[in-house]
Amino acid sequence: MTSTDIASDTELAAGGPVIAHLAPNIPRRFYRGGERIFAFRSAATPGDFDGRRPEDWLGSTARLFAEGGGGVTTLADGTELPDALAADPVGWLGAAHAARFGGDPNLLTKLLDSGERLPVHSHPSRDFAKAHLDCDHGKTEAWIVLAAEPGATVWVGFRDELGEDELAELVDAQDERLLEACNPISVSAGDAVLVPAGQPHAIGEGVLVLELQEPTDFSVMLEHERFGLELDHAFLGLDRPLALRSVDHGPLSAERIASLRTRWADVEGQGPALPDEGSEYFRAEVVRPVGAPVTVDAAYAVVVAVAGRGAIDSAQGSLAVAAGDVLLVPHAAGPLTVSGDVTLIRCMPPAP
């Protein structure tokens, strides 16, 4: 299975785009993982699976910065998603979004399965990306934890303030001190964590997350040697001192960490899956009918069924959904009514 695998069941109706089932879109990466994604998606593990397919790029208009440049979603008619959005931004994204952003969805959604601990890395802010990477998007991101092994840990932010020389020394050393400098956070299924651009972070082994991100693959790999990454890849093609200027030197306090966390699993009916601070970059909403169907407004969204079975009704008809399904929903589908014993997470761009 490759990053060119297409979305299944997508056809363009005469009136515009319709709801699409998305097949796995799993490019090869430099770190291990992927088995939890295939299990969650109820998809057969491909014969050529090499243990390094840890990310499923959902409704993606972004490409890998390195490692072959794949990642873009291709629709069933062979159209790449960026081209489809550009051809009908109002139908896909809605008039208000199209007026502000054109055909840019302002969103990258992924499933990520950490078959090993990820390297300590960070992502640049919008301002840094505009100044040095010729891009309007940085990479604030959020993790919605779907499954986690007992004792699973993530790390976000430096525990103490590091001077410029101290950070450079840790990056030079490429040893355990870099991870030890970060704040460990225990996570379990149902947690959510917002990771602002610039904050160094890592995901420990044994975690399956649904990620929302700004639509780039910009990463400054503070740890890179043990993962076999070339320096040009590790530092985004920039000089190392410049790349390290994108990193927040800390400290990230316990109070600040608490403000970046929430429990999406506690939502019943309809409610936010992420801290409000993230809404400038993207939105995630839990939809869980409890005793009665729930109707949600029209919106472009990547919809992930994370538990149970149910149905989605819209002006375009009725669609059965079950855990592991991923849908690409255009604004043109109109309001959706969700029923049944199902939990959905709607991943959406920022409000226009």
Residue spans of the language-model regions?
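His/acidic/aromatic-lined binding-pocket segments of jelly-roll/cupin-type domains
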Residues: T109, L118, C135, E141-I144, ...
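Ligand-binding loop in jelly-roll beta-barrel domains
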Residues: D113-R117, A148-G151, Q199-F218, S318-A322, ...
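Double-stranded beta-helix
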Residues: W155-L178, L210-G250, I345-P352
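Intrinsically disordered, low-complexity linker/loop segments enriched in Gly/Pro
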Residues: A142, A147-A189, L194
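Short, basic/aromatic beta-hairpin or loop at an interaction surface
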Residues: L162-D175, D297-A307, A311
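Transition-metal
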Residues: M1-L162, E225-E255, L260, A284
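Short acidic-glycine-tyrosine-enriched beta hairpin
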Residues: C182-L194, S314-A333
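Short beta-strand segments in beta-sandwich/barrel cores
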Residues: A292-P293, G308-D313, V326
